[in-house]
Swiss-Prot record:
Keywords: Cell cycle, Cell division. Prevents the cell division inhibition by proteins MinC and MinD at internal division sites while permitting inhibition at polar sites. This ensures cell division at the proper site by restricting the formation of a division septum at the midpoint of the long axis of the cell. It comes from the Bacteria. The lineage of its organism: Bacteria, Pseudomonadati, Pseudomonadota, Gammaproteobacteria, Alteromonadales. It comes from Shewanella amazonensis (strain ATCC BAA-1098 / SB2B). This is Cell division topological specificity factor.
Length: 85
């Protein structure tokens, strides 16, 4: 029985760590959106539409983040994973 318990405990630990990692990603994403201006979701969608005029991408391939520094400086970071040619 101890051999079976050994394999079962590994699956629980890996699924728990995977769930923790996913939750951290979701929380980080929500934190970045919390301080974003009201126009931010629409701007993100329009950026995706412009890119789609040239290359098909899904929304998961685009990451848009707005970072604000203490010096009243805002930085818009855009990461796009383009498909292979």
């Amino acid at each position: 029985m101890s051999l079976l318990d050994y394999f079962r405990s590994n699956k629980k630990a890996s699924s728990a760590s995977l769930a923790k990692e996913r939750l951290q990603i979701i929380v980080a994403h929500q934190r970045t959106e919390r301080g974003a201006p009201d126009y931010f979701p629409q701007m993100k969608q329009e950026i995706i539409e412009v890119i789609r005029k040239y290359v098909y991408i899904s929304e998961e391939q685009v990451s848009v983040q707005l970072e604000q520094n203490d010096d009243n400086l805002s930085v818009l970071e855009l990461n796009v994973t383009l498909p292979e040619r």
